[in-house]
Amino acid sequence: MRPKKDGLEDFLRLTPEIKKQLGSLVSDYCNVLNKEFTAGSVEITLRSYKICKAFINEAKAHGREWGGLMATLNICNFWAILRNNRVRRRAENAGNDACSIACPIVMRYVLDHLIVVTDRFFIQAPSNRVMIPATIGTAMYKLLKHSRVRAYTYSKVLGVDRAAIMASGKQVVEHLNRMEKEGLLSSKFKAFCKWVFTYPVLEEMFQTMVSSKTGHLTDDVKDVRALIKTLPRASYSSHAGQRSYVSGVLPACLLSTKSKAVETPILVSGADRMDEELMGNDGGASHTEARYSESGQFHAFTDELESLPSPTMPLKPGAQSADCGDSSSSSSDSGNSDTEQSEREEARAEAPRLRAPKSRRTSRPNRGQTPCPSNAEEPEQPWIAAVHQESDERPIFPHPSKPTFLPPVKRKKGLRDSREGMFLPKPEAGSAISDVFEGREVCQPKRIRPFHPPGSPWANRPLPASLAPTPTGPVHEPVGSLTPAPVPRPLDPAPAVTPEASHLLEDPDEETSQAVKALREMADTVIPQKEEAAICGQMDLNHPPPRGHLDELTTTLESMTEDLNLDSPLTPELNEILDTFLNDECLLHAMHISTGLSIFDTSLF
């Protein structure tokens, strides 16, 4: 059977001499599979090592700073071709040479190395303040996507996926070369690529084909089989484990092929403390958490909420707006008896007035009764009209069998963990001032503190100041009120509300977008409120924005009078700086930012 030639044209930037040696090696390997030659007679293992070494030398000579990526792609394509030619043969004709036995393990090593370098390209760019161009980032994301999918089914026939990996890698290399010719790549980005795209270690790749007796490469099948069984990371089976030594390098969130949509980053310095402060001990839960809690239906507690009810939580058909002068409401309740009306009046009279907020529902007169005779004598105050207008626009009535307060909801980490809704304040924080008028308690509008990202001028303010209501005008007590006026609590001075800040407080979606924007700017700016936060006793922001070692490398490169040829051996100072990248303390912080924020839209691919 003749060898497949569809993969020989996908190699990147090879000289004609290397292509000729490659074609001869693939032909001899197919002849070994057909039992026309023996593997020892044509030295398949040694020639495979030499061709992989030629890939690395060619990439170092002409691949510039991203030569490691080119060498990895060429080696991956070479072993994929050997793998595809092996599976096309029958079982009795295949698997009688060292390369055929060790091919799955070598393929696993190459794919793991490709995933490591592409992951590091995205993970460690924010920690070192490296801006990735849009075209290069999009092409690199496609390459990472195809490589990760292949890593889970590497033992099967690669076929089309091999072509997809090589096509994506070729697109990345072409974008890098084009932008390099146009002078659009900075020295910092090129140094970052040289550090990220490392070359595969051939000694580790061919460790399964080294004889335990002589210490050299061998084509003895028995010796290779015995060596594979003793390796800790290799598995001589049809389906090896999905994870390899990369599990100790990559986090669990990056080992998934399907990314989870996260609207707002969670694991940011100071966000957990703010979350605990806002959640509190009682009454602290968002709309989404309360909706999926085990405490019953969500609309039974919506009297305590400030925002409008969600469309997914419809009110009961009987819960409609009822005003004193509404004729439609009185006509709809024509069937109510005098007994029901008296029971409602007695229940309203016996309920405490200064405790939890009551329902805004008024007594509904029967047919023929004059509606609201007490309000006709006194002029309607402007604050009363505002409350009536708010009640008409937002009819919310609690269920009689349910309590009028929102019970605490147990927070479950990782389950529907989002900050879409607005948090409820604590009852003792003075967020609502109640007024009693004619046996009916009216609650003034409350201002609920939304989520503010670390670094926002509102993030370091005390919680009572953020929860304090802004007085809209003088509140006049009614003349006929028998209850004493509530004593106002001393409130902390509220910060000056600018038009931009008031717009952020009113629109939760805009607040979320501003939070994401602020978190993206944390990698480039220093938080100016660090000293103010320590004085106020609020969040202690001891985690400054990440500052990677590439800043030192950039300073060194800019201080040089002549251009540095990165293809030549680097100075000891630069080598020391590059070696310290692996121990960068900002890697974990940048990992959360890169995985939490959607850098590229996955729906486009």
From Swiss-Prot:
InterPro entries assigned: Herpes_TAF50
Bias type Low complexity, positions: 321-338
Bias kind Basic and acidic residues: ranges: 341-353
One record GO biological process: release from viral latency
Pfam families hit by this protein: Herpes_TAF50
Protein family according to the UniProt entry: Belongs to the herpesviridae Rta family.
GO CC annotation: host cell nucleus; viral tegument
Broad class of the protein's primary localization: host cell
Residues covered by region (Disordered): 307-381, 447-509
Subcellular location: Host nucleus; Virion tegument
Protein name as annotated: Replication and transcription activator
Species this chain originates from: Epstein-Barr virus (strain AG876)
